Amino acid sequence: MSELATQKAGEGTVSRLLNVVESELQAGREKGDPTEKQLQIILEDAPLWQRFKEVTNEMIVTKNGRRMFPVLKISVTGLDPNAMYSLLLDFVRTDSHRWKYVNGEWVPAGKPEVSSHSCVYIHPDSPNFGAHWMKAPISFSKVKLTNKLNGGGQIMLNSLHKYEPQVHIVRVGGAHRMVMNCSFPETQFIAVTAYQNEEITALKIKYNPFAKAFLDAKERNHLKDVPEAISESQHVTYSHLGGWILSNPDGVCTAANSNYQYATPLPLPAPHTHHGCEHYAGLRGHRQAPYPSAYMHRNHSPSVNLIESSSNNLQVFSGPDSWTSLSSTPHASILSVPHSNGPINPGPSPYPCLWTISNGGGGPVASGSEVHASTSGTILLGNPAVTSPSSLLPTQATTSAGVEVLGEPSLTSIAVSTWTAVASHPLPGWGGPGGAGRHSSSSLDS
């Protein structure tokens, strides 16, 4: 009894499978013609192929083989649904010369290479019933093009030659005979080892679904480069402040109002940002210091203190984090700064063009004055262009000065040419039409 049940179950399974096959082939039978007189082959994605042909399509050939894009797809009707057919694909040259890409176009370039072995690709579904071939479009997506004769079902093509795919339908099962072969001019291409035309590259990326990952990665890299480019532009503007003039470059600040008077030192903390002040982290060391390292040593302190004396002169006081300056004798360093006493452009008064920076602090040096170094070495630098984040009011105050620092054991000469000061608000007591600058109360006079 159990054997009979098993036999019936097996018959039911076979019947179900045959029904699946029958229903699968039914769609193909509806398009069939036992006489094969109405046999027809249609190219799928013809508009896409035509778009590539307009700019001369290119296909990559590699040693290991590269698949085609666009993929060759065809639809077949008019086959005998019950007959067996195999579909084959090969590539034939369309002309008798090589090609080269010159000045944005393909031009003939001499005689062709000797034709290699004619390789034929057999569709992996072959052989099969005509109903199978007619039920859905036939794709040759697994075809690989190579420039080496290595077998494995790959199609060998010569680079820089133009080819056209040809589809062949062969009836099998009994006497084999050719039923039809056809080709489509839209599918012509030049075999290359790398794309020559940028338009072809763009079309491949745009329409090839397997190239979307490459496109997305390219876009991600582009978006990632945007903040890097912005950061780089900030470095170009401010990086010289970080490793050159200011002892602690973590704070870069401009006055938010014209009443810039503080009775006590004003610290510029690095960890936060407030109105009129922007924090630029990571600028220290962006550029190399302009002086030999033998004369400069770095200490560390958390902030830079700004204080304005009773004479309204802005001073910069560096904490322990400062450049250890050159040692010099009390009367060894003399600075002479020539400056034109002509009127300054109308508008906000500029910051002084020169700053003193040392361990003990120093004040701004007005144009047209002399400063005598009487402490343990003073480094006098020009004030480069500093852009105010709140308002951009460039005021040109050029000074051609020669700065000489006598140090031990050698003489260091620093030529400072054009210095530009940019102010956002006027400061009383700093220059002005017809007026000379002042020395701060902490300026060092001999």
Swiss-Prot record:
Naming one, the record's GO cellular component terms include: nucleus
**A Pfam entry, by short name:** T-box
The family database entries (PROSITE patterns) matched by this protein are listed as:
TBOX_1, TBOX_2, TBOX_3
Name a GO molecular-function annotation.
Answer: DNA binding
Give one GO biological process term: cell fate commitment
In this entry, the residue ranges of the DNA-binding region are 43-216
Instruction: Give UniProt keywords alphabetically.
Output: Activator, DNA-binding, Nucleus, Repressor, Transcription, Transcription regulation
Subcellular localization, as worded in the UniProt entry: Nucleus
| Principal localisation | nucleus
**Protein purpose:** Transcriptional regulator involved in developmental processes. Can activate POMC gene expression and repress the alpha glycoprotein subunit and thyroid-stimulating hormone beta promoters.
PANTHER family registered for this protein in UniProt: T-BOX PROTEIN-RELATED, T-BOX TRANSCRIPTION FACTOR TBX19
What is the name attached to this protein's record?
Answer: T-box transcription factor TBX19
> Which species is listed as the source?
Mus musculus
Its taxonomic placement starts with: Eukaryota, Metazoa, Chordata, Craniata, Vertebrata
